[in-house]
Amino acid sequence: GFYFLKGDGARLEHALIQFMRDVHREQGYREVFPPIPVNSRSMRGTGQFPKFVEDAYRLGGGNDEPYDDDDLWLLPTAEVPVTNMYAEDILLPEDLPIKHQAYTPNFRREAGEHGTETRGMVRVHQFNKVELVNFVEPGESDERLHGLLGEAEEVLERLGLPYRILEMCTG
């Protein structure tokens, strides 16, 4: 579930995070450092709730108790607060595209799920990541998706890591 990084491991993680933040800044992403606790309204607004409520860490209460809009949860992904920065806004075409990156620790209870698709993976309840969030006009979403793929590939290529791209059905 949880782990310590010490010495070289801790330095390596910090270096990789900084490297990715620098690369994405070069790619035109604006950095955001969002809050770690988020409210239920934000979780619902990004599709995390009700589907993933059992995977979330609630602050000050159990997941089996009813929750209201103001209850707080540990961040499952930076997408929740970053997209909710615009929850009350109308984004006009001239404001787009908007490209944000956010480094955050993330918390999920799903660590116990195992199966053939997770063979060889170690699942944990807390992990760090640099998230990319893009807002574009609907007609540009496919092009932006391919742009995101290229931006992720650039990180892997600059690190000299081998990779492959899989096209998978999610529906």
Placement of each model-derived feature along the sequence:
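TRNA-recognition modules of translation machinery and tRNA-sensing kinases, especially anticodon-binding
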Residues: G1-G171
